Amino acid sequence: MSRIMATIVKPVEQKTKHLDYFLSQCHRRRYPAKSTIIYAGDKSDSLFYIVKGSVTVIIEDDDGREMIMAYLNAGDFFGEMGLFDNMDSRSAWVKAKTECEVAEISYTKFREIAQQDPRVLYFIGEQM
């Protein structure tokens, strides 16, 4: 029985360790419900992690109508498209659906910590 528990507990401990390290490198901010966290068209230079709360990802169609693309919750990332696609500007608005605590890290800092410990990339990849 202890072997089974070890195979469960060890990966959880590793994930917690990587998350704690990742969050220690981030700037945390709180946003009231319905406030805008990201504006479409803004410079794309940061990755965000939802520590607490939920957000809505919104785009505009060709007629200017808002379309909800996703609801994201604690444990989810957003703002990653610019990290992987080299996009210069944000393609969507992200608004706090509820009161939120969000951790933000610049793409530059994220790449630095990923070079120092590539296992962080695997942790992040599992979350996306």
Predicted ranges, named:
Residues 1-35, 72, 78, 82-86, ...:
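Cyclic nucleotide-binding regulatory module and flanking cytosolic helices
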Residues 34, 45-58, 73-75:
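Glycine- and acidic-residue-biased ligand/ion/polar-headgroup-sensing regions
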Residues 37-42:
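Short phosphate-coordinating micro-motif centered on Lys-Gly-acidic
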Residues 30, 48-49, 95:
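Well-ordered beta-strand positions
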Residues 55-67:
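A short beta-strand-loop-beta hairpin characteristic of the jelly-roll/cupin
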Residues 70-126:
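Cyclic-nucleotide recognition modules
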Residues 26, 44-45:
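Short loop/turn microsegments at loop-to-beta-strand junctions
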